[in-house]
A protein has these predicted regions:
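C-terminal subdomain of alpha/beta-hydrolase-fold enzymes, centered on the catalytic histidine
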Residues: 1-122
Length: 122
């Protein structure tokens, strides 16, 4: 779901003026229509509201973790934070395109990052 923040507004604006940026005008309209017609925007956003205080306080994550930083993400996690939050950080990378819904916006980049993250665990 597109959020109500500056990054989301910029992403939507780029889509509507025809600039490249990951989302097309149809993508934005599909997303808004999906939440409007199913009346699920509030329940989809509930996760963010409930976890707002704990987001920066990740504790007890004992499995291997990979972090990819997308430029249009709501919070681009710095390496120093990722290392503190995830003691078993096995992959950290910054990419040039994508945002909060990277798998939807940039599926090729997302799948490449997933493969890179878990290649060492094979």
């Amino acid at each position: 779901m597109l959020d109500h923040d500056v990054r989301s507004y910029e992403l939507i604006a780029r889509a509507f003026v025809g600039e490249p940026g990951g989302l097309s005008r149809d993508d934005v309209l599909d997303n808004v229509t999906h939440y409007w017609l199913t009346n699920t925007a509030i329940s989809a956003a509930r996760l963010y509201w409930e976890s707002k205080l704990a987001f920066f306080d990740a504790k007890g994550v004992e499995i291997p973790v990979g972090v990819t930083v997308f430029p249009d993400e709501l919070y681009p996690a710095p390496l120093s934070w990722a290392e503190r939050a995830y003691p078993k950080l096995i992959h950290y990378n910054k990419v040039e395109q994508g945002g909060h819904f990277a798998a939807w916006e940039q599926p090729q980049i997302f799948s490449t990052e997933m493969r890179s993250t878990f290649r060492s665990l094979r």
